[in-house]
């Protein structure tokens, strides 16, 4: 399947564009020999960072081994000098959720059939050591527009490979579908996909999600607590068996959560003709229409924001005669409106045009949504303003860096305040250090520092961390380097400031960041009223 030498153009004719991402475009293509149609994801590898390239290789590796009727299949993977081509099934049926609202009849039994196909794909993934991590409506497609077309799971860009003896720590997924263990930054594995299935099944039955809040922090608090319910009247007509399955999927403790294989054996799924209700659910269809409209509106807003940022960097690079290394572009509103007198590069013009098209689509979606609101949407519609935006490991890395800066500042504050209890909670008992007070010796453990906490408690000391630079070293380790300013009063009450360069290595153990090494470069002070250690 992997072809590293044959040119893509030698085997495929490229047709119209089907979609576009930050560093890739999806086009319909036709195999020259067989005449079969496919969807080619074309990635510009010149614009990828080393981390992004690793993700691409991981996605291709995972997709190559997944061969299932309910998964969008990868048929070919071709690496060329500047581009990588992933050739997938061409699925023409659109999103599952969009198809449901166009149906004349939709029942609980239909929802059972939908979730069964999703669970079949997830069970297959899990049996092959793959966790999808981004189950959501946008990634549930239909093979064709034919009645009864198979549901296809798509987009394995965030998928990971795991085994039964290991867990993952990366923060990835889409907010409304994230599991409690991911939000708590606990180790996680296959059960995260089952939680997302529970959210999807809830939506399939009533047309709105189980967790909702306009404030993302409150949304996350709901999810971590598993705080959802079955309000009347829409849930009164749902069978107890369906609610029981949702409860088993939305179990906060991942160890007690039902597995995909177990869920497939539940009578509501494997014997739906006898257990699931066959009554048409018009209210669900109506709510789902509004749910879809909100998803599309938010996607358009995200597209406008992304393209605006991207086109501005391109504008900047064009005016300076250089190209941004990450390939992103951004520009201001006046340039979009055409009020700038500066000449525009062809690439910038394309970015501006894309922004204008996205803005037009956004306006149309906004009008449609307003029209739907005027028709009187039910008060039970629930959707978070953030719930459709996918979070990947890059977002996780930003959050991880912020955590490192925060915990480092807390440690410095503990030193300034002579708070040895907090200091010991933040430092590993075997922490090593190089510092002037040790006269060039490598010190192990924290007892050496106790002396500085026990003495001079009345000194006023304030520490400021400047320009922290965090390097992430895997999932459980990080290094931070910074300039430290220490302000203090001497015995005569005169203020002094001392500057030093410091670096700390942090390791996450049992869910907590602990400092395992510190190195500080400065001359020991002749003034003994304060130590910086």
Curated annotation (Swiss-Prot):
Keywords: ATP-binding, Calmodulin-binding, Cell projection, Cytoplasm, Kinase, Magnesium, Metal-binding, Nucleotide-binding, Phosphoprotein, Serine/threonine-protein kinase, Stress response, Transferase
GO cellular component: axon; cytoplasm; neuron projection; perikaryon; postsynaptic density
Name of the gene encoding the protein in the UniProt record: unc-43
Reactions catalysed according to its record: L-seryl-[protein] + ATP = O-phospho-L-seryl-[protein] + ADP + H(+); L-threonyl-[protein] + ATP = O-phospho-L-threonyl-[protein] + ADP + H(+)
Phosphothreonine modification, residue list: 284
Family: Belongs to the protein kinase superfamily. CAMK Ser/Thr protein kinase family. CaMK subfamily.
CDD domains cross-referenced by the UniProt entry: STKc_CaMKII
Entry's localization field: Cytoplasm; Cell projection, Axon; Perikaryon
Location, primary (coarse class): cytoplasm
Enzyme Commission no: 2.7.11.17
Organism: Caenorhabditis briggsae
Catalytic machinery residues: 134 (proton acceptor)
Keyword set includes Kinase: yes
Obligatory cofactor(s): Mg(2+)
Protein purpose: Role in locomotion and neuronal cell fate specification. Required for the regulation of synaptic density, egg laying, defecation, and meiotic maturation. Required for viability under chronic osmotic stress in which it acts downstream of osr-1. Regulates the synaptic trafficking of glr-1. Bidirectional modulator of neurotransmitter release with negative modulatory effects mainly mediated via slo-1 activation. May suppress the functional response to an internal pacemaker, perhaps by modulating the activity of the IP3 receptor.
UniProt subunit comment: Dodecamer. Subunits are tightly packed around a central ring-shaped scaffold with extensive contacts between the regulatory segment of one kinase and the catalytic domain of another enabling cooperative activation of a subunit by the adjacent molecule. Interacts with and phosphorylates daf-16; the interaction promotes daf-16 nuclear localization. Interacts with egl-2 and tir-1. Interacts with nsy-1.
InterPro entries: Ca/CaM-dep_prot_kinase-assoc, Kinase-like_dom_sf, NTF2-like_dom_sf, Prot_kinase_dom, Protein_kinase_ATP_BS, Ser/Thr_kinase_AS
Residue ranges, annotated region (Disordered): 316-347, 369-400
Pfam families: CaMKII_AD, Pkinase
Polar residues bias (residue ranges): 316-345, 377-391
Protein name: Calcium/calmodulin-dependent protein kinase type II
Keyword Cytoplasm in annotation: yes
């Amino acid at each position: 399947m992997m072809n590293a030498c044959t040119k893509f153009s030698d085997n495929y004719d490229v047709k119209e564009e089907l979609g576009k991402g930050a560093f890739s475009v999806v086009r319909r293509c036709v195999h020259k020999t067989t005449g079969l149609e496919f969807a080619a994801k074309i990635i510009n590898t010149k614009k990828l960072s080393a981390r992004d390239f690793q993700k691409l290789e991981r996605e291709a590796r995972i997709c190559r081994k997944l061969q299932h009727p309910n998964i969008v299949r990868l048929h070919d993977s071709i690496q060329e000098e500047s581009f990588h081509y992933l050739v997938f099934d061409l699925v023409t049926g659109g999103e599952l959720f969009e198809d449901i609202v166009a149906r004349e009849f939709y029942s609980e039994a239909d929802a059972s059939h939908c979730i069964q196909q999703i669970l079949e794909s997830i069970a297959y993934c899990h049996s092959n050591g793959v966790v999808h991590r981004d189950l959501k409506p946008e990634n549930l497609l239909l093979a064709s527009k034919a009645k009864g077309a198979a549901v296809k799971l798509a987009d394995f860009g965030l998928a990971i490979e795991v085994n039964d003896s290991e867990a993952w720590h990366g923060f990835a997924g889409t907010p409304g579908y994230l599991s409690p263990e991911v939000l708590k930054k606990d180790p996680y594995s296959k059960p995260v996909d089952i939680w997302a299935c529970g959210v999807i099944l809830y939506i399939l039955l009533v047309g709105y999600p189980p967790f909702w809040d306009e404030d993302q922090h409150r949304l996350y608090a709901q999810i971590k607590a598993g705080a959802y319910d079955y309000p009347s009247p829409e849930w009164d007509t749902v069978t107890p068996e369906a609610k029981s399955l949702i409860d088993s999927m939305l179990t906060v403790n991942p160890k007690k959560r039902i597995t995909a294989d177990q869920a497939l054996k539940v009578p509501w799924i494997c014997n739906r003709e006898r257990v699931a209700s066959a009554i048409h659910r018009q209210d669900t269809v109506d709510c789902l229409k509004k749910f879809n409209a909100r998803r599309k509106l938010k996607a358009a807003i995200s597209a406008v924001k992304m393209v605006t940022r991207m086109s501005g960097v391109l504008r900047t690079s064009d005016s300076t005669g250089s190209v941004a290394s990450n390939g992103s572009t951004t520009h201001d509103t006046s340039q979009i409106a055409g009020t700038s007198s500066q000449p525009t590069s062809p690439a910038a013009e394309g970015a501006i045009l894309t922004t204008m098209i996205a803005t037009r689509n956004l306006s149309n979606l906004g009008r449609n949504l307003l029209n739907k609101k005027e028709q009187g949407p039910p008060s039970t519609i629930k959707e978070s303003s953030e719930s459709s935006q996918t979070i990947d490991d890059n977002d996780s890395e930003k959050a991880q860096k912020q955590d490192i800066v925060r915990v480092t500042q807390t440690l410095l504050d503990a030193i300034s305040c002579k708070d040895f209890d907090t200091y010991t909670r933040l430092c590993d008992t075997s922490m090593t250090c190089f510092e002037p007070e040790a006269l060039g010796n490598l010190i192990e453990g924290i007892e050496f520092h106790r002396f500085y906490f026990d003495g001079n408690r009345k000194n006023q000391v304030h520490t400021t961390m400047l320009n922290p630079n965090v390097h992430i070293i895997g999932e459980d380790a990080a290094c931070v380097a910074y300039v430290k300013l220490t302000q203090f009063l001497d015995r005569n009450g005169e203020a002094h400031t001392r500057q030093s360069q410091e670096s700390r290595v942090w390791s996450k153990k049992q869910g907590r960041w602990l400092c395992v090494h510190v190195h500080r470069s400065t001359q020991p002070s002749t003034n003994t009223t304060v130590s910086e250690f």
